[in-house]
Protein backbone atom coordinates (compact mmCIF):
# COMPACT_ATOMS: atom_id res chain seq x y z
CA UNK A 1 0.00 0.00 0.00
CA UNK A 2 1.35 3.46 -0.84
CA UNK A 3 2.09 5.67 2.13
CA UNK A 4 0.01 8.82 2.25
CA UNK A 5 1.73 12.16 1.78
CA UNK A 6 3.47 13.55 4.84
CA UNK A 7 0.81 16.24 5.28
CA UNK A 8 -1.88 13.61 5.71
CA UNK A 9 0.07 11.28 7.98
CA UNK A 10 -1.39 10.88 11.45
CA UNK A 11 0.85 9.32 14.09
CA UNK A 12 -0.67 7.28 16.89
CA UNK A 13 1.63 6.51 19.85
CA UNK A 14 0.47 3.53 21.92
CA UNK A 15 2.01 3.26 25.38
CA UNK A 16 2.24 0.02 27.34
CA UNK A 17 3.76 -0.55 30.77
CA UNK A 18 4.86 1.79 33.51
CA UNK A 19 4.90 5.53 34.14
CA UNK A 20 8.46 5.73 32.77
CA UNK A 21 7.07 4.61 29.42
CA UNK A 22 4.31 7.21 29.68
CA UNK A 23 7.00 9.85 30.14
CA UNK A 24 9.06 8.56 27.20
CA UNK A 25 6.01 8.58 24.93
CA UNK A 26 5.22 12.14 25.98
CA UNK A 27 8.77 13.19 25.07
CA UNK A 28 8.44 11.46 21.69
CA UNK A 29 5.10 13.17 21.00
CA UNK A 30 6.49 16.54 22.05
CA UNK A 31 9.33 16.17 19.56
CA UNK A 32 6.92 15.09 16.82
CA UNK A 33 4.64 18.06 17.47
CA UNK A 34 7.64 20.43 17.39
CA UNK A 35 8.46 19.05 13.93
CA UNK A 36 4.94 19.78 12.75
CA UNK A 37 3.73 16.20 12.81
CA UNK A 38 0.10 15.33 13.46
CA UNK A 39 -0.09 13.25 16.65
CA UNK A 40 -3.54 11.73 17.17
CA UNK A 41 -5.46 9.52 19.54
CA UNK A 42 -5.73 5.76 19.21
CA UNK A 43 -7.38 4.29 16.11
CA UNK A 44 -7.03 7.53 14.15
CA UNK A 45 -3.45 7.15 12.96
CA UNK A 46 -2.14 5.64 9.75
CA UNK A 47 1.34 5.45 11.32
CA UNK A 48 1.59 3.60 14.63
CA UNK A 49 4.37 3.67 17.22
CA UNK A 50 4.12 1.03 19.97
CA UNK A 51 6.11 1.79 23.13
CA UNK A 52 6.47 -1.64 24.72
CA UNK A 53 7.11 -3.14 28.16
CA UNK A 54 9.43 -6.12 28.64
CA UNK A 55 9.49 -6.44 32.42
CA UNK A 56 7.61 -9.65 33.29
CA UNK A 57 5.73 -12.35 31.38
CA UNK A 58 2.29 -10.71 31.45
CA UNK A 59 3.67 -7.37 30.28
CA UNK A 60 5.68 -9.04 27.53
CA UNK A 61 2.61 -10.93 26.35
CA UNK A 62 0.56 -7.72 26.18
CA UNK A 63 3.31 -6.03 24.17
CA UNK A 64 3.69 -8.94 21.73
CA UNK A 65 -0.07 -9.16 21.24
CA UNK A 66 -0.27 -5.44 20.51
CA UNK A 67 2.55 -5.68 17.97
CA UNK A 68 0.82 -8.63 16.30
CA UNK A 69 -2.48 -6.74 16.22
CA UNK A 70 -1.00 -3.76 14.39
CA UNK A 71 1.23 -5.87 12.14
CA UNK A 72 -1.97 -7.60 11.04
CA UNK A 73 -3.70 -4.24 10.50
CA UNK A 74 -0.77 -3.20 8.32
CA UNK A 75 -1.08 -6.45 6.36
CA UNK A 76 -4.77 -5.70 5.78
CA UNK A 77 -4.09 -2.11 4.73
CA UNK A 78 -5.68 -0.52 7.81
CA UNK A 79 -2.46 1.27 8.76
CA UNK A 80 0.53 2.23 6.62
CA UNK A 81 3.48 1.82 8.95
CA UNK A 82 4.22 0.23 12.33
CA UNK A 83 7.24 1.10 14.48
CA UNK A 84 8.12 -0.54 17.79
CA UNK A 85 10.23 0.94 20.59
CA UNK A 86 10.62 0.51 24.35
CA UNK A 87 11.86 -2.20 26.66
CA UNK A 88 10.63 -5.28 24.79
CA UNK A 89 12.26 -4.04 21.60
CA UNK A 90 15.48 -3.25 23.46
CA UNK A 91 15.61 -6.70 25.01
CA UNK A 92 14.38 -8.94 22.20
CA UNK A 93 14.94 -7.04 18.97
CA UNK A 94 16.58 -9.90 16.96
CA UNK A 95 13.80 -12.30 17.96
CA UNK A 96 11.08 -9.78 17.16
CA UNK A 97 12.59 -8.93 13.78
CA UNK A 98 12.61 -12.63 12.95
CA UNK A 99 9.16 -13.52 14.31
CA UNK A 100 7.23 -10.35 13.36
CA UNK A 101 9.00 -9.02 10.26
CA UNK A 102 5.99 -7.00 9.08
CA UNK A 103 6.94 -4.23 11.52
CA UNK A 104 8.74 -1.47 9.61
CA UNK A 105 11.48 -0.98 12.20
CA UNK A 106 12.36 -1.78 15.81
CA UNK A 107 14.13 0.67 18.14
CA UNK A 108 15.71 0.38 21.58
CA UNK A 109 15.17 2.57 24.63
CA UNK A 110 17.99 5.00 23.74
CA UNK A 111 17.24 5.50 20.05
CA UNK A 112 14.85 8.45 20.09
CA UNK A 113 16.77 10.39 17.38
CA UNK A 114 16.68 7.39 15.03
CA UNK A 115 12.97 6.80 15.69
CA UNK A 116 12.20 10.45 14.97
CA UNK A 117 14.19 10.27 11.74
CA UNK A 118 12.17 7.23 10.66
CA UNK A 119 9.02 9.25 11.33
CA UNK A 120 10.30 12.13 9.21
CA UNK A 121 10.92 14.37 12.22
CA UNK A 122 13.99 16.17 13.53
CA UNK A 123 15.48 15.43 16.94
CA UNK A 124 15.82 18.72 18.81
CA UNK A 125 17.99 18.38 21.91
CA UNK A 126 16.92 21.77 23.22
CA UNK A 127 13.34 20.49 23.45
CA UNK A 128 14.11 17.61 25.81
CA UNK A 129 11.63 17.84 28.67
CA UNK A 130 9.04 19.68 26.58
CA UNK A 131 6.45 16.96 26.32
CA UNK A 132 2.96 16.44 25.00
CA UNK A 133 1.50 15.29 28.31
CA UNK A 134 -1.16 12.58 28.28
CA UNK A 135 -2.10 12.69 31.96
CA UNK A 136 -4.92 14.89 33.31
CA UNK A 137 -3.83 18.53 33.20
CA UNK A 138 -3.29 18.79 36.96
CA UNK A 139 -0.46 16.24 37.30
CA UNK A 140 2.56 15.07 35.36
CA UNK A 141 5.45 12.65 35.77
CA UNK A 142 8.98 14.00 36.15
CA UNK A 143 11.61 11.38 35.34
CA UNK A 144 14.69 12.37 37.31
CA UNK A 145 16.98 9.56 36.15
CA UNK A 146 17.13 6.62 33.78
CA UNK A 147 18.48 3.13 34.35
CA UNK A 148 19.60 1.36 37.52
CA UNK A 149 22.90 0.30 39.11
CA UNK A 150 21.34 -2.13 41.59
CA UNK A 151 22.20 -5.84 41.23
CA UNK A 152 18.76 -7.28 42.12
CA UNK A 153 18.78 -10.86 40.90
CA UNK A 154 15.16 -11.00 39.70
CA UNK A 155 15.14 -7.75 37.72
CA UNK A 156 15.72 -7.25 34.00
CA UNK A 157 15.49 -3.45 34.04
CA UNK A 158 19.26 -2.84 33.80
CA UNK A 159 19.26 -5.04 30.67
CA UNK A 160 16.70 -2.75 29.06
CA UNK A 161 17.41 0.64 30.59
CA UNK A 162 21.13 0.50 31.31
CA UNK A 163 23.09 2.06 34.15
CA UNK A 164 21.76 4.93 36.27
CA UNK A 165 21.98 8.31 34.54
CA UNK A 166 20.67 11.29 36.52
CA UNK A 167 19.31 14.47 34.98
CA UNK A 168 20.77 17.70 36.35
CA UNK A 169 18.85 19.67 38.93
CA UNK A 170 18.87 22.65 36.57
CA UNK A 171 17.29 20.68 33.72
CA UNK A 172 14.63 19.17 35.98
CA UNK A 173 13.73 22.55 37.47
CA UNK A 174 13.37 24.02 33.97
CA UNK A 175 11.17 21.11 32.92
CA UNK A 176 9.03 21.41 36.05
CA UNK A 177 8.66 25.17 35.53
CA UNK A 178 7.37 24.51 32.02
CA UNK A 179 4.87 21.99 33.34
CA UNK A 180 3.69 24.46 35.99
CA UNK A 181 3.12 27.13 33.34
CA UNK A 182 0.89 24.65 31.52
CA UNK A 183 -1.28 24.15 34.60
CA UNK A 184 0.37 21.17 36.28
CA UNK A 185 -0.08 21.32 40.05
CA UNK A 186 1.33 17.91 41.06
CA UNK A 187 4.71 16.48 40.11
CA UNK A 188 5.20 12.73 40.45
CA UNK A 189 8.93 12.06 40.62
CA UNK A 190 9.83 8.75 38.98
CA UNK A 191 12.99 6.73 38.38
CA UNK A 192 14.06 3.14 38.64
CA UNK A 193 15.61 4.21 41.96
CA UNK A 194 14.93 7.70 43.32
CA UNK A 195 17.33 7.22 46.22
CA UNK A 196 20.30 6.79 43.86
CA UNK A 197 19.65 10.16 42.25
CA UNK A 198 22.73 12.34 41.87
CA UNK A 199 25.45 9.81 42.69
CA UNK A 200 26.68 9.78 39.09
CA UNK A 201 26.54 13.57 38.62
CA UNK A 202 27.34 14.98 42.02
CA UNK A 203 29.08 12.02 43.73
CA UNK A 204 26.45 12.14 46.46
CA UNK A 205 22.77 11.40 46.91
CA UNK A 206 21.06 14.61 45.83
CA UNK A 207 17.32 13.89 46.01
CA UNK A 208 17.00 16.27 48.94
CA UNK A 209 18.69 19.09 47.00
CA UNK A 210 16.40 18.46 44.05
CA UNK A 211 13.32 18.65 46.27
CA UNK A 212 14.55 21.91 47.83
CA UNK A 213 14.73 23.38 44.32
CA UNK A 214 11.39 22.01 43.13
CA UNK A 215 9.37 23.31 46.08
CA UNK A 216 10.28 26.87 45.05
CA UNK A 217 8.42 26.59 41.73
CA UNK A 218 5.29 28.72 41.63
CA UNK A 219 2.16 26.74 40.78
CA UNK A 220 3.46 23.36 41.93
CA UNK A 221 1.52 22.39 45.05
CA UNK A 222 2.22 18.67 45.45
CA UNK A 223 5.42 16.69 44.86
CA UNK A 224 5.13 12.91 45.15
CA UNK A 225 7.94 10.35 45.42
CA UNK A 226 7.84 7.05 43.55
CA UNK A 227 10.18 4.07 43.50
CA UNK A 228 12.62 4.57 46.35
CA UNK A 229 15.04 1.81 47.36
CA UNK A 230 15.34 0.68 51.00
CA UNK A 231 19.15 0.56 50.99
CA UNK A 232 20.96 3.89 51.29
CA UNK A 233 17.82 5.97 51.65
CA UNK A 234 18.81 9.67 52.08
CA UNK A 235 17.24 10.52 55.43
CA UNK A 236 17.39 14.27 54.79
CA UNK A 237 14.43 13.68 52.47
CA UNK A 238 12.26 12.94 55.51
CA UNK A 239 13.27 16.22 57.15
CA UNK A 240 12.33 18.10 53.99
CA UNK A 241 9.05 16.18 53.70
CA UNK A 242 8.11 17.12 57.24
CA UNK A 243 9.09 20.77 56.75
CA UNK A 244 7.77 21.45 53.26
CA UNK A 245 3.98 21.27 52.80
CA UNK A 246 4.40 20.78 49.04
CA UNK A 247 6.07 17.39 49.54
CA UNK A 248 3.29 14.81 49.89
CA UNK A 249 3.54 12.67 53.02
CA UNK A 250 3.76 9.64 50.76
CA UNK A 251 6.44 7.32 49.48
CA UNK A 252 6.47 4.32 47.16
CA UNK A 253 9.25 1.99 48.31
CA UNK A 254 9.15 -1.50 46.73
CA UNK A 255 10.50 -3.97 49.30
CA UNK A 256 9.93 -7.19 47.28
CA UNK A 257 10.31 -9.53 50.30
CA UNK A 258 11.33 -9.58 53.94
CA UNK A 259 12.67 -13.08 54.65
CA UNK A 260 16.43 -12.69 55.14
CA UNK A 261 17.24 -15.75 53.03
CA UNK A 262 15.15 -14.48 50.12
CA UNK A 263 16.52 -10.93 50.44
CA UNK A 264 20.05 -12.33 50.30
CA UNK A 265 19.31 -14.38 47.19
CA UNK A 266 17.59 -11.36 45.61
CA UNK A 267 20.76 -9.30 46.32
CA UNK A 268 18.74 -6.55 47.92
CA UNK A 269 21.52 -5.48 50.28
CA UNK A 270 19.30 -5.31 53.35
CA UNK A 271 17.70 -7.45 56.06
CA UNK A 272 14.36 -7.70 57.79
CA UNK A 273 15.76 -5.90 60.83
CA UNK A 274 17.17 -3.00 58.81
CA UNK A 275 14.02 -2.66 56.72
CA UNK A 276 11.74 -2.68 59.75
CA UNK A 277 13.86 0.01 61.41
CA UNK A 278 13.77 2.12 58.24
CA UNK A 279 9.98 1.99 58.03
CA UNK A 280 9.61 2.83 61.71
CA UNK A 281 12.01 5.74 61.21
CA UNK A 282 9.80 6.93 58.32
CA UNK A 283 6.71 6.94 60.49
CA UNK A 284 8.48 8.55 63.44
CA UNK A 285 9.95 11.33 61.29
CA UNK A 286 6.74 12.03 59.34
CA UNK A 287 3.68 11.03 61.39
CA UNK A 288 0.80 10.00 59.17
CA UNK A 289 3.02 9.26 56.17
CA UNK A 290 1.44 6.87 53.65
CA UNK A 291 3.79 4.06 52.62
CA UNK A 292 3.17 2.09 49.44
CA UNK A 293 5.17 -1.04 48.69
CA UNK A 294 5.37 -3.90 46.21
CA UNK A 295 6.07 -7.53 47.05
CA UNK A 296 7.10 -10.59 45.04
CA UNK A 297 5.97 -14.09 46.01
CA UNK A 298 7.11 -17.40 44.55
CA UNK A 299 10.77 -16.42 44.15
CA UNK A 300 13.02 -19.49 43.67
CA UNK A 301 13.49 -21.28 46.96
CA UNK A 302 10.66 -19.45 48.76
CA UNK A 303 9.48 -21.90 51.42
CA UNK A 304 6.29 -21.93 53.43
CA UNK A 305 8.36 -20.51 56.29
CA UNK A 306 9.57 -17.63 54.10
CA UNK A 307 6.00 -16.92 53.07
CA UNK A 308 4.78 -16.97 56.68
CA UNK A 309 7.52 -14.47 57.57
CA UNK A 310 6.27 -12.23 54.77
CA UNK A 311 2.65 -12.47 55.94
CA UNK A 312 3.67 -11.64 59.52
CA UNK A 313 5.54 -8.60 58.24
CA UNK A 314 2.55 -7.37 56.24
CA UNK A 315 0.32 -7.71 59.29
CA UNK A 316 2.89 -6.00 61.51
CA UNK A 317 3.66 -3.02 59.27
CA UNK A 318 0.13 -2.35 58.01
CA UNK A 319 1.14 -0.69 54.76
CA UNK A 320 -1.19 1.99 53.49
CA UNK A 321 -0.96 0.73 49.91
CA UNK A 322 0.43 -2.44 48.38
CA UNK A 323 0.81 -4.44 45.20
CA UNK A 324 1.87 -8.08 45.07
CA UNK A 325 3.16 -10.01 42.06
CA UNK A 326 3.96 -13.62 41.32
CA UNK A 327 7.64 -14.08 40.49
CA UNK A 328 8.46 -14.13 36.77
CA UNK A 329 11.55 -16.17 35.76
CA UNK A 330 13.42 -13.73 33.50
CA UNK A 331 16.29 -14.85 31.28
CA UNK A 332 19.68 -13.14 31.64
CA UNK A 333 18.97 -12.17 35.24
CA UNK A 334 20.88 -13.57 38.21
CA UNK A 335 17.86 -15.49 39.46
CA UNK A 336 17.48 -17.23 36.10
CA UNK A 337 20.34 -19.50 37.16
CA UNK A 338 18.17 -20.73 40.03
CA UNK A 339 15.51 -23.39 39.72
CA UNK A 340 12.05 -21.85 39.32
CA UNK A 341 10.75 -24.35 41.85
CA UNK A 342 7.56 -22.74 43.18
CA UNK A 343 4.61 -23.98 41.07
CA UNK A 344 2.58 -21.31 39.28
CA UNK A 345 -0.58 -22.21 41.17
CA UNK A 346 1.28 -21.75 44.48
CA UNK A 347 2.63 -18.39 43.33
CA UNK A 348 -0.86 -17.21 42.43
CA UNK A 349 -2.35 -18.51 45.68
CA UNK A 350 0.30 -16.74 47.74
CA UNK A 351 -0.22 -13.50 45.84
CA UNK A 352 -3.97 -13.67 46.48
CA UNK A 353 -3.39 -14.43 50.15
CA UNK A 354 -1.14 -11.41 50.57
CA UNK A 355 -3.65 -9.16 48.81
CA UNK A 356 -6.48 -10.54 50.94
CA UNK A 357 -4.48 -9.55 54.02
CA UNK A 358 -3.87 -6.13 52.56
CA UNK A 359 -7.55 -5.70 51.69
CA UNK A 360 -8.48 -6.08 55.35
CA UNK A 361 -5.72 -3.68 56.40
CA UNK A 362 -6.86 -1.17 53.78
CA UNK A 363 -10.47 -1.52 54.93
CA UNK A 364 -9.51 -0.83 58.54
CA UNK A 365 -7.33 2.16 57.63
CA UNK A 366 -10.03 3.65 55.41
CA UNK A 367 -12.71 3.29 58.10
CA UNK A 368 -10.54 5.51 60.30
CA UNK A 369 -10.92 8.27 57.70
CA UNK A 370 -14.70 8.50 58.12
CA UNK A 371 -15.72 11.98 59.20
CA UNK A 372 -12.30 13.44 58.43
CA UNK A 373 -11.73 16.20 55.88
CA UNK A 374 -8.90 15.98 53.36
CA UNK A 375 -7.55 18.35 50.74
CA UNK A 376 -8.11 16.54 47.44
CA UNK A 377 -7.11 17.17 43.85
CA UNK A 378 -9.95 16.47 41.42
CA UNK A 379 -8.61 14.46 38.46
CA UNK A 380 -11.71 13.93 36.34
CA UNK A 381 -15.44 13.36 36.08
CA UNK A 382 -16.37 9.76 35.35
CA UNK A 383 -19.92 8.49 35.12
CA UNK A 384 -21.89 9.95 37.98
CA UNK A 385 -18.89 10.94 40.08
CA UNK A 386 -16.12 13.47 40.30
CA UNK A 387 -12.94 11.52 41.04
CA UNK A 388 -10.17 12.92 43.20
CA UNK A 389 -7.26 11.91 45.41
CA UNK A 390 -5.76 12.87 48.76
CA UNK A 391 -2.04 13.58 49.15
CA UNK A 392 -1.76 9.97 50.34
CA UNK A 393 -2.84 8.54 46.99
CA UNK A 394 -1.09 8.33 43.64
CA UNK A 395 -2.99 8.13 40.33
CA UNK A 396 -4.11 4.75 38.98
CA UNK A 397 -2.69 2.60 41.80
CA UNK A 398 -4.14 3.97 45.05
CA UNK A 399 -7.41 5.05 46.65
CA UNK A 400 -9.72 7.41 44.82
CA UNK A 401 -12.15 9.83 46.41
CA UNK A 402 -15.57 9.76 44.72
CA UNK A 403 -17.99 12.70 44.94
CA UNK A 404 -21.58 12.24 43.77
CA UNK A 405 -21.92 14.50 40.73
CA UNK A 406 -25.72 14.49 40.95
CA UNK A 407 -25.51 16.23 44.34
CA UNK A 408 -22.30 18.24 44.24
CA UNK A 409 -20.17 20.17 41.78
CA UNK A 410 -16.40 20.44 42.05
CA UNK A 411 -14.01 21.73 39.42
CA UNK A 412 -11.64 19.25 37.81
CA UNK A 413 -7.98 20.10 38.09
CA UNK A 414 -8.52 22.04 41.32
CA UNK A 415 -8.00 21.36 45.02
CA UNK A 416 -11.13 20.93 47.14
CA UNK A 417 -11.62 20.06 50.82
CA UNK A 418 -13.64 16.85 50.96
CA UNK A 419 -15.28 15.26 54.00
CA UNK A 420 -15.25 11.44 53.90
CA UNK A 421 -18.71 9.96 54.44
CA UNK A 422 -18.19 6.35 53.30
CA UNK A 423 -15.24 4.03 52.75
CA UNK A 424 -14.46 0.65 51.18
CA UNK A 425 -11.12 -1.17 50.92
CA UNK A 426 -9.84 0.88 48.02
CA UNK A 427 -12.20 3.84 47.60
CA UNK A 428 -13.41 6.75 49.67
CA UNK A 429 -16.68 8.61 49.17
CA UNK A 430 -17.04 12.21 50.17
CA UNK A 431 -18.72 15.58 49.84
CA UNK A 432 -17.37 19.13 49.78
CA UNK A 433 -16.64 20.26 53.33
Curated annotation (Swiss-Prot):
InterPro entries: Elp3/MiaA/NifB-like_rSAM, Methylthiotransferase, Methylthiotransferase_CS, Methylthiotransferase_N, Methylthiotransferase_N_sf, NA-bd_OB-fold, Ribosomal_uS12_MeSTrfase_RimO, rSAM. Residues 9-124 form the MTTase N-terminal domain. SMART domains: Elp3 (SM00729). One of its GO terms (molecular function) is aspartic acid methylthiotransferase activity. It comes from the Bacteria. [4Fe-4S] cluster 2 binds at residues 148, 152, 155. This is Ribosomal protein uS12 methylthiotransferase RimO. The lineage of its organism: Bacteria, Pseudomonadati, Bacteroidota, Flavobacteriia, Flavobacteriales.
Amino acid sequence: MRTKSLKKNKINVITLGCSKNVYDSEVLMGQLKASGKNVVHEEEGNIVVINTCGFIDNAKAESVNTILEYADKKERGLVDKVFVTGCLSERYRPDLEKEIPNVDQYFGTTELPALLKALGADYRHELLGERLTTTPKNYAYLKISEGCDRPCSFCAIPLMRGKNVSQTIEKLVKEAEGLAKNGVKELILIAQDLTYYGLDLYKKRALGELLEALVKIEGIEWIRLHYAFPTGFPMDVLEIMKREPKICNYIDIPLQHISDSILKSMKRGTTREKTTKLLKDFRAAVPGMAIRTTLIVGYPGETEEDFEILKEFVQEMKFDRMGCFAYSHEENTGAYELVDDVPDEVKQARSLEIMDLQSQISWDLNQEKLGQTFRCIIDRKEGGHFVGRTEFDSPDVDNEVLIDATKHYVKTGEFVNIKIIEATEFDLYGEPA
